[in-house]
C-alpha cells in the first residue's frame, strides 16, 4: 500500500510536492484554503486572511529560464521577467498538464497538525481540516508544509515612539494593492527591500513626495545585466559560484562592491550598506536611482520618532505633513496549525536540517518546503526540496543521525544558513533561512542523485558541459541524469539563450550573438593575472 502524504498549500511548492510524491509512488492529498492554485502568485484586489498578498504591479525578479519547473519550460514568447498574471497562467497550465488538480482539496483550511499516538512507531500525523463549517481529521504517513512565509505581516509599531499619536494613516505593504489612493499625498515607506522599493517607485509617479527610511540601506541591482541579458543568466553560473567560493574573502568582497557600483555609485544616492564590503542580498529595482535623480523619491535613515504629522529621522532631519506611512517590514514566520516546539529547539530558533527536516524528530516524516531563500529562483529550489523529501518518505533516501543533523544545522546557522530576522529587512521577526543558491541546490541534487556530473559531461558531451558549467545554472540541469532524468533537458539547456532573446527580438536587425562558453573560459584563464593585480593593489 502506498504511503499517504498530506501537503499544506497549493502554491508552487505545493504543486512541486504533489508531482514529486507521484514520481516516488506516494499518494498525495493537498489542502488549499483558497479556490485556486498559485499561492503567493494568485492575485486578489483585496487582502485575504491567512493568505499571502501581492500588489497589482508585481513582476518576478528571476528570469523565466531560471525559475521554471525543471521539466516544464515557459512558452518561447513569454517575457523574461513575468507579471504575476502570466506566472499564474503558467502555474495553472503546469497543474493541468501534470494532472495535479485532482489531488487538491480547495477551500479547505488546515487548522491542526499533530502526531498520532503511535508516532514513535509509525511516524504518522493527524491533519485536522475545516470546510463548509465541518471539521475532519485524516491520518497521513507524512506531511509536507508548503504554505510559504509571506502570510503574517510584521508591523513593528512598538519600535517607533510617537506612532500612536500620528494623525495620518499607516499600513503594512501586504495591504498595498495600487497607487491610486496615494495620488497627491506625502508618503513615507519604511523598509528598503524588494517590496518597499517597488512600492516607493510606483508611488513616486503619483504622490507629491515619497521618502524611503532604511536602517542599513542596500545594494540595488537592475534586472538587466551585461549586454542586456537577465541578471541571473549571467550571475548564477557554476563558474561564478566557483570563483566566489575560492577567492579570498577580501578579494571577492572587493569585486562584489565594484560590480554593485558599476550601475551607479551607491554612496551618492544614500544607498551604500552600512558595511560596504558586506555581500548583503541586493534589492532588484530598475527605476530607483532614476526616481531619486528626478527628485520624486529620497532615501533617509531610520525613523527616530513620530510626531502628530511628521517623522524625525536619526540624522535629525524631518519629513513633515505626512499623509501615509507604509511599513515594508517583512513577515513573521508562523505555522499556527503546528506545535511550535516541533521546529524550534536550541535558543528558540528555527532548527531545520538543510532548511527542510526538523532534526530532533523521532521519525523523518515532516518536511518544510520553500522556507530557504537564496539569490536564486524559488521554483527549482522548492522542486529539489520536495523531491528529496519525497524520497526520504519513500525510503529511497536516508537522513544522517540526529547528532549529525544537529551539528550540521548549528554550523549552517552560524555560517551559510543564517537565521535572518525578516527576509531582506532589518525590522522583521521571520526566521527565513538564507544560503548560496548553487551550493544549496547542488547539495540537494547530490542527495537525490541528480546533480550533473561535470567531468563526465566534459568527456562525453563537451558542448553541453561548457553550457552547464559556464552558462546559467538553469533548473533543467537537475533533470539531465539520475532518477528523474528528462529527455528534453539537454535540448532545453542548449536552446535557453534562444528562448531568452525570442520575446525581445521584435525587430530583427542582425544575428544575435549570445554569450559563448569560451568567453567564460578565457575569463578563467585570465584569473591568475586578475588575482595578482588585486593582490598588488592591496599590498
UniProtKB/Swiss-Prot annotation:
Record SUPFAM superfamilies: FAD/NAD(P)-binding domain
InterPro entries named among the record's database cross-references: FAD/NAD-bd_sf, Flavin_mOase, Flavin_mOase-like, Flavin_mOase_3, FMO-like
Protein name according to UniProt: Putative dimethylaniline monooxygenase [N-oxide-forming] 6
Reaction(s) the record says it catalyses: N,N-dimethylaniline + NADPH + O2 + H(+) = N,N-dimethylaniline N-oxide + NADP(+) + H2O
One GO term describing the cellular component: endoplasmic reticulum membrane
Localization terms from the record: Microsome membrane; Endoplasmic reticulum membrane
EC category: oxidoreductase
E.C. number: 1.14.13.8
Superkingdom in the source lineage: Eukaryota
Gene (UniProt): FMO6P
Annotated NADP(+) binding sites: 195-198
Residues annotated as transmembrane: 518-538
Entry's family note: Belongs to the FMO family.
Organism: Homo sapiens (Human)
Keyword tags: Endoplasmic reticulum, FAD, Flavoprotein, Membrane, Microsome, Monooxygenase, NADP, Oxidoreductase, Transmembrane, Transmembrane helix
PANTHER family referenced in this protein's UniProt entry, alphabetically: DIMETHYLANILINE MONOOXYGENASE (PTHR23023)
General function of this protein: It is probable that this protein is only produced in very small quantity or not at all as the gene coding for it seems to be unable to produce full-length transcripts.
Membrane topology value: Single-pass membrane protein
Gene3D superfamilies xrefs: FAD/NAD(P)-binding domain (3.50.50.60)
Known cofactor(s): FAD
GO molecular-function terms, A-Z: flavin adenine dinucleotide binding; N,N-dimethylaniline monooxygenase activity; NADP binding
Binding site for FAD: 9-13, 32, 40-41, 61-62
